[in-house]
């Protein structure tokens, strides 16, 4: 009957909608956790430089942090920004693992690293960086207070 079809359709809609909302909340819970940690330790986010990857910068920028990279390609190419080819630099860093050059060049305050990339394993054991906060997806590092 029409009522049975309508009821079944509503059940499917509510189930799918609930799954979408749950997935969306889970997707942002890890980056939000890191952001809240940083907000709890920084009084002026606009003065804080954060190394971020392609997919994470926009979230932190929303809260006022200065981020290395986000998904806006128009500002990542030297032909447009007239300063650095950030997107190419990022690609080389991810492929070759030369994170130290990029990290030193920009003098970041924080390094937001996804735990599923190879750079995480390098940085985790690099004595020049100290882990400050982590969750399932991200690790947040700062420069360690070590003499060279």
What are these regions (language model features)?
Residues 81-140:
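Periplasmic/luminal catalytic loop of GT-C fold multi-pass membrane glycosyltransferases
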Residues 1, 12-15, 34, 86-90, ...:
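Generic structural signal of hydrophobic/aromatic residues within well-ordered alpha-helices
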Residues 39-82, 108-116, 141:
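Short periplasmic/luminal acceptor-recognition loop of GT-C membrane glycosyltransferases, typified by
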């Amino acid at each position: 009957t029409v009522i049975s079809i309508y009821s079944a359709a509503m059940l499917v809609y509510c189930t799918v909608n609930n799954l979408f909302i749950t997935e969306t909340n889970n997707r942002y819970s890890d980056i939000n956790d890191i952001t809240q940690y940083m907000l709890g330790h920084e009084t002026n986010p606009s003065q804080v430089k954060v190394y971020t990857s392609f997919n994470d910068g926009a979230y932190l920028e929303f809260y006022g942090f200065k981020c290395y990279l986000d998904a806006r390609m128009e500002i990542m190419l030297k032909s447009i920004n007239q300063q650095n080819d950030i997107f190419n630099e990022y690609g080389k860093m991810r492929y070759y693992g030369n994170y130290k050059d990029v990290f030193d060049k920009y003098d970041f305050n924080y390094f937001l690293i996804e735990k599923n990339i190879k750079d995480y394993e390098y940085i985790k054991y690099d004595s020049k960086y100290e882990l400050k906060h982590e969750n399932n997806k991200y690790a947040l590092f700062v420069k360690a207070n070590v003499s060279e």
